[in-house]
Amino acid sequence: MDYNLALDKAIQKLHDEGRYRTFIDIEREKGAFPKAQWNRPDGGKQDITVWCGNDYLGMGQHPVVLAAMHEALEAVGAGSGGTRNISGTTAYHRRLEAEIADLHGKEAALVFSSAYIANDATLSTLRVLFPGLIIYSDSLNHASMIEGIKRNAGPKRIFRHNDVAHLRELIAADDPAAPKLIAFESVYSMDGDFGPIKEICDIADEFGALTYIDEVHAVGMYGPRGAGVAERDGLMHRIDIFNGTLAKAYGVFGGYIAASAKMVDAVRSYAPGFIFSTSLPPAIAAGAQASIAFLKTAEGQKLRDAQQMHAKVLKMRLKALGMPIIDHGSHIVPVVIGDPVHTKAVSDMLLSDYGVYVQPINFPTVPRGTERLRFTPSPVHDLKQIDGLVHAMDLLWARCALNRAEASA
């Protein structure tokens, strides 16, 4: 086999379809987020505003987080020195897991090197722990959930997105005695819509199923202490396993699950993705713990309120211009263009001509024909920056003769 030719064909296919991913080299400046500097391909530098980051609340720059990380770094050094089982468990990891468990009202938590690995490792391990487990998965679940569900082959049922009637139809058709788990998300990141948590929990109770919720795009962002949509809606006690991230609203790095002590102990003991991975650096654990603790407070609520206000303002301004946005009331602002080449072109022009950095979102992240720009306004974006973004979008939409009819929600 000509391996180089095969690689060339694979990469060329992405170019031909307009979905080859280009990394934008940026340098964030401490204390200045969302401002950054773009290292242009021609060697020049350009000041930009980041509009597509997952540091939703700017906590990656917060003095409380940085102070905790500096203190830990000076106290114990850089790496953890091992897996959790072999010299890699520290007081920082223990405190972080206790903070997470308290956040979700659970007995225990387990920290992974990413939320992707937490999903993959946990869902695949549940098949080992519960032989014959049937997993019911929302059709728009994240890739990490899909991979975990596919691993350790077992029965799975895919229900139409947020369609609880279809879920009930599928679960009612299966063996009542079989172990069951419903896996879904609280906020779906590409459309910004919410999962029907209460209705899914009702079905789980009726059929004796476990509930597994991915709150990656919700933790830190919703609820009086930032525990997510389940907390906001008073439903945390009805969820068996929470998955979350430390790398989005909390602004640091890593992922986790929170559940009963018995469930966490079993996953800890059986999940290869946990057992054979080096643990988080102590400074990372310290920063994440400080971020979670801060966002539980009234000061954290002020950040959430400011973020929601900026998201509403941006949506209102874009709607007034007839932009094809999808608005489900979340913090995510998708603007649908519907063509990968056009989406990339608009993204490139926003960056080079206006200093607005928003990454194009193409297939397979979203279905073909729904390619989009996905804006994530934060509390540290100001109204002047929103004005600049809206002005740039208006000019480019006219220049490129793009559709101004509102997208279907």
Swiss-Prot record:
The active site is at 248. Pfam families: Aminotran_1_2 (PF00155). Coiled coil: none annotated. Keywords: Acyltransferase, Heme biosynthesis, Pyridoxal phosphate, Transferase. Its EC number is 2.3.1.37. Its cofactor is pyridoxal 5'-phosphate. Belongs to the class-II pyridoxal-phosphate-dependent aminotransferase family. Homodimer. PANTHER family: 2-AMINO-3-KETOBUTYRATE COENZYME A LIGASE, MITOCHONDRIAL, CLASS II AMINOTRANSFERASE/8-AMINO-7-OXONONANOATE SYNTHASE. This is 5-aminolevulinate synthase. It comes from Rhodobacter capsulatus (strain ATCC BAA-309 / NBRC 16581 / SB1003).
